Amino acid sequence: MDYQNQKSNENKHGEKLMMKNRSKFVGVRQRASGKWAAEIKDTSKNIRMWLGTYKTAEEAARAYDEAAFLLRGTNTRTNFSTTHSIPTNSPISLKLKNLLHRKSISNLSQSKNQCTLMSSSLQGAPIDNSIMVMENENKSSCSSEESKSLFWVQNQLVSEYNPYGVDMNMMNCSIGITPNTLQIDYSWPLPQQRINELPTLNDSVNVYGMNECYVEGTYESKYEYDVNYPLSHLFCFT
């Protein structure tokens, strides 16, 4: 019971001290030593400045009013009327100017550092060469395929697109064309209907073409190939 009464008395005494130390002025509080401290804050500018300690609460309140007027202008809340002019060379004024100057330099330095960091990161970014590599690979692949395709045409395509087994070398010799001198363009696909139109073999035909003409063995004629069409149409000139 005695312990509870003692604790209650201590709490009441602490509340009295807090009420006594609480100032009626804005930005002023009493320290444990009995002196009054003034401090100003501005959350919009992220500023907190210590104005010093004073013997009386009124002196601390006037210091706060001066700093608030210099920082926020005439629309700020003050403890006393600020109609009188405030000297620009007062200690509080000089202290506040130095604080604002250091703050602006710090902000400018941070912005420059951010710009430099962004610029260096962009300049040092690796260039994606996958597209160029892919293009080069495609070009080399196409080049090799073209070479292979040309070789294959010269060696294989003639027999594949000659379903009737016509001996092209014998035909060339019969019409006076020496081997390896005839250039045939097989780059176009052979239409299916052209294959169906090929004539059937018989004894009376000794030269074969693509539904164009045929020549009996007794006629003297000149023949030449159309190199711009698959399986080279055989044209007759009398």
Curated annotation (Swiss-Prot):
Keywords attached to this entry: DNA-binding, Nodulation, Nucleus, Transcription, Transcription regulation
GO BP of this protein: negative regulation of DNA-templated transcription; nodulation
Tissues with expression: Expressed in roots, root hairs and leaves.
Entries under Pfam families matching the protein: AP2 (PF00847)
GO molecular function annotation: DNA-binding transcription factor activity; sequence-specific DNA binding
Subcellular location: Nucleus
Triggers of expression: Induced by Nod factors in root hairs.
Family matches, as Gene3D superfamilies: AP2/ERF domain
Highest rank taxon of the organism: Eukaryota
Residue ranges the UniProt entry marks as DNA-binding: 24-81
GO cellular component, as recorded: nucleus
Functional description taken from the UniProt entry: Transcription factor involved in symbiotic nodule signaling in response to rhizobial Nod factors (NFs). Binds to the GCC box (NF-responsive box) of ENOD11 promoter. May act as transcriptional repressor of NF-responsive box-containing target gene promoters in root hairs.
Protein family membership: Belongs to the AP2/ERF transcription factor family. ERF subfamily.
Protein name, as recorded: Ethylene-responsive transcription factor ERN3
Origin species: Medicago truncatula (Barrel medic)
Gene that this sequence comes from: ERN3
